[in-house]
Amino acid sequence: MLGKKTSPKALPKRRGFILYQGPSMLDGAPIVVIATLSTSNVKTGDAIQTWILRDDMNPVEATKTGDDSSICGSCPHRHFNNGACYVNVGQAPNQIWKSYKRGLYEQYDHKLHADYFRSRVVRLGAYGDPAAVPFEVFHIIARLARAHTGYTHQANHKNFDKRYFTLCQVSADSPKQATKYQKQGAKTFRVAMEGDGLLPGEIECLSDSDGIQCVDCKLCDGVSQNIAIAVHGSRSSKFNTAIIARG
């Protein structure tokens, strides 16, 4: 019938896709990147989550042996360093790795699967640091998606690809660090202790101040805004201790 609108064809249901299998850009060890299409994460909202994992070992084991450096690099908050990382590696990362080993995720094919990303917000690195992944992998996905968010702790790593300044906020653990990275041209995401003020040009994370989800905010894209957030998570006291120890 003339003038009748047709709904777009629904995409076949998928759990997720393997975006990359290959060497870590940080140390050359084998890693895998998996995008999962559904989430229950209340803070981010309905974003595609990407998980950066060791290919050859369970993520729980990797955190115990220190081999998580392939995906977390020099992040001071790694569990191996008794740090303040809020990710419970035994939950989602572990389950996703097990599902991957059971063959439950398809290899991403741009011609077949691009539409799964086009109308979505993508979170680069729900676990693991995006800088462990070849820049081109996430650059393609970020350009395809409606929007993206991402964070890296690797700005000082010897193998850091500075093109990630255009995709990710640089994580900062102090006002001094934030100022340093901003002078290098990065947008920062600073974790602040309770009572800290904002630096010039910073705004408070809108999830904290206004309850806005990441899918609606979309400012943590590496180019929009410097952000600060109060330290959070069950291991936050370890962050406080580390910051106090460093002065």
Q: Regions from the language model: what does each represent?
A:
Residues 1-247:
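Class I S-adenosyl-L-methionine
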